[in-house]
Amino acid sequence: MAGVPVFMRRILLTLTIASAFIGMNAPASAETITLVADEWCPYTCKPDSDKPGLFIEIAKKVFAREGIDVTYKTIPWARAIEETRAGKYTSIAGASIGDARDFIFPTEPQAQSVMTFYVKYGSRWTYQNLASLDKISLGTIVDYSYSNLIDSYIAKNKDNMRLVQQVGGNNALESNVLKVIKKRVGATIESAAVMEYYLATQGRTGQLIAAGAMPVNDDQNLYIAFSPKDPNAKRYARIVTDGTRALRQSGKIQEILNRYSLTEEKVSR
């Protein structure tokens, strides 16, 4: 600082010290994870809405305890799995183990799905066993897992449109409902909570009716599952496990369910 007046040296020194102090005390950028799913309300609903979905509200609560921010977007389910598997996103929300067996799962499920068959009102068909499916064409969604038994049936018959018809995209549920109504398929299979929520909110209550369900077992557990490419996946899975247990023990999870007119008995054993 040769040649700089003394008073200017003091100002520059003060500014340097102040800048260093501010830098030392500036908050670090918050850690952020990105969840993706298709629209599968009430589990995963529209982003940025007052009711983004059960899984999104659970995720935000459990990660907030760790100072981690959560962002959420909806894309078709097949893409959600593929791009999260590749490491583009952190996690898929509302997944069963059968959806993506290579992902990192919490040990505590966030909910459960009772996979139920639905037919057009007036239909006499009901699900009895796999043999009963031979009498209809079943509407399903690409890359969904419905239970080990039904997944195997779909894989075996996916190229036989008389038995299995698959749809994808953001409006897959609506597509299957319309196909049942128009008798393009004899039945569709869907989570009871999802189908009942859809029919009620779309003014279609009574147009489709339940016609049997799969036995409730661990095949139907649903999770927030993490990308196998993410180095923090195991840590995130532990956070979700511990956080979900804490929400259940405190009764906070029922407060979330109340917002979607659900009881824990309906989404959990």
Q: Predicted segment positions?
A:
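Extended ligand-binding regions for polar small-molecule ligands
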Residues: 56-65, 131-137, 144, 224-259
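A ligand-binding cleft/hinge motif common to bilobed small-molecule-binding domains
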Residues: 82-85, 95-103, 152, 186-218
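Acidic, polar ligand-binding/catalytic clefts
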Residues: 60, 72-133, 143-146, 213-214
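Extracytoplasmic small-molecule ligand-binding "clamshell" domains
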Residues: 30-103, 169, 250, 259-263
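A bilobed periplasmic-binding-protein/Venus flytrap-type ligand-binding module shared by bacterial periplasmic
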Residues: 116-126, 219-234
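Ligand-binding cleft/hinge of the Venus flytrap
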Residues: 59-66, 108-109, 145-169, 177-179, ...
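Short loop->beta-strand "edge-of-pocket" segments that line small-molecule binding or catalytic clefts
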Residues: 32-45, 130-148
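Sec/Tat signal peptide C-region and signal peptidase I cleavage site
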Residues: 24-30
